[in-house]
Amino acid sequence: MAVPKRKMSRSNTRARRSQWKAEAPTLVKTIENGKVVYSMPHRARVIEDAAGTPLYMEYKGRKVADV
């Protein structure tokens, strides 16, 4: 395992770490019940009744799991 020869300064450490950036998630615009909804692609979504109780999960128009 490599061992640094000298201690890295706080400013150099923070400058190196500042390059680690989170990527924004890709969102897909869909229309559900007349409303525009943004969701992540290739994910199952939870179908709820009018009261907001989760019923099941759906993917590509098919029921894939019970909640």
From Swiss-Prot:
Biased composition (Basic residues): 1-19
GO biological process, one term: translation
Transmembrane segments: none
GO CC, one annotated term: large ribosomal subunit
Keyword Ribonucleoprotein: yes
GO MF: structural constituent of ribosome
Keywords, alphabetical: Ribonucleoprotein, Ribosomal protein
Top-level lineage group: Bacteria
InterPro entries the record matches: Ribosomal_bL32 (IPR002677), Ribosomal_zn-bd (IPR011332)
Classification via Pfam families: Ribosomal_L32p
Region feature (Disordered): 1-21
Sequence similarity: Belongs to the bacterial ribosomal protein bL32 family.
NCBIfam families: rpmF_bact
Name the record gives this protein: Large ribosomal subunit protein bL32
Naturally occurring in which organism (per UniProt): Clavibacter sepedonicus
